[in-house]
Amino acid sequence: MQSGLMGELLELTLEHVGLVSVAMAIATAMAIPAGILLTRREALRRWVLGFANIMQTVPSLALFGFLIPLPFIGGIGKHTAIVALVLYALLPILQNTLAGIVGVDRAVRESAIAMGMTGRQLLWLVELPLAARTILAGVRVATVITIGTATIAAAIGGGGLGVFIFRGLASVDTKQILAGAVPAALIALAADKGLSWVEQKFWRG
């Protein structure tokens, strides 16, 4: 019985990490280019950031429920869970990408242009390297948020460690709740510390 529980814990932990990894990969691939675009199109900033802010204010369970009826997402299951997690992860990465690039010293930017750099070269060789630490900080925040929010995925059949939590709530079983909550918290802590280490390793001072 004990080995069966450990096996299920391992399976749900891997499932949880998988949900978070896919959602973060999609969110990062969307938010960084969008953040770059917003540095070039100021008129879009209010609308795009406004949408991302709205997604953050919607209660997580409500957002999961709202997405279920949408036919192009896929109803109950992992697809809907991933879409919801992506929407929650967008804002920190988007904001930090924008802040990082906009925050590049104007003198540095002007020097690069004076050297004959094109807009593309300026972005790839100057702005993104200087903004990378800020962008990574946004990814770190989004990752921790996503790990916690992913526990709600079990409510719509998305799996993950939330399965233990919801099962424990239904049966008033504290051990089941802790079996889901503690590993999720440890994963979030490990992700935060790991990304923080990367940040300090490559951008000391």
Question: Residues of each region from the PLM?
Answer:
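Short, membrane-interfacial amphipathic segments enriched in basic
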Residues: M1-G7, L37-L38, Q121-W124
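Loop-to-helix entry region at the N-terminal start of transmembrane alpha-helices
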Residues: E11-L19, F66-P92, A131-A132, Q176, ...
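Short cytoplasmic-facing helical segments at TM-TM junctions of multi-pass membrane proteins
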Residues: N96-I135, V141, I165
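C-terminal transmembrane helix and the adjacent membrane-cytosol boundary/short C-terminal tail
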Residues: E42, L98-V102, R106, A114, ...
